[in-house]
Amino acid sequence: MNKRVAIIVGGTGQFGISIAKLLLKKSYKIIITTRNLKKKINLKDKNLKINKLNIYNKNQIKNLFKKNNPYIIFFLAGQSSPVKSFKSKKETYKSNFLGCKKILEVIKNEKINCKFLNAASSEMFGKINGKIK
């Protein structure tokens, strides 16, 4: 039986490593993507790979997904620091929105049958008046 594959986009932080550890215990094959392969993570396993990925490059995304047939994709990339997000609004918009959008477009256009989780804060939507429908 083939192992289920989880791709953790931007998974070198605390949350990504925690997800990877949990899923490795459940016998998943894990692919963590990062923009910087120099960043070291303290996790080694025969079912874990670290891949460099440009989240704005649809061909790289498509190749990764087609090659690995993910069961689930976690999108953890992007700016997570509120202080930094206000200092570099364009980069925050690019990484948090456009990067996620590119991933979703590839999933849709290539008909990748997977679960998708975007870990984000409701703060990204700003102040909402009334109920969300």
Where are these regions (language model features)?
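Conserved catalytic-core motifs of eukaryotic protein kinase domains, centered on the activation segment
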Residues: 43, 83-91, 127-132
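NAD(P)H-binding glycine-rich loop region in Rossmannoid oxidoreductase-like domains
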Residues: 55-94
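N-terminal Rossmann-fold cofactor-binding loop
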Residues: 33-38, 55
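Rossmann-fold cofactor-recognition segment
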Residues: 45-57
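Conserved Rossmann-fold NAD(P)-dependent oxidoreductase catalytic core, especially the SDR/UDP-sugar
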Residues: 75, 101-133
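Short beta-strand element of Class I
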Residues: 29-31
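N-terminal Rossmann NAD(P)H-binding glycine-rich loop of SDR-like oxidoreductase domains
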Residues: 6-26
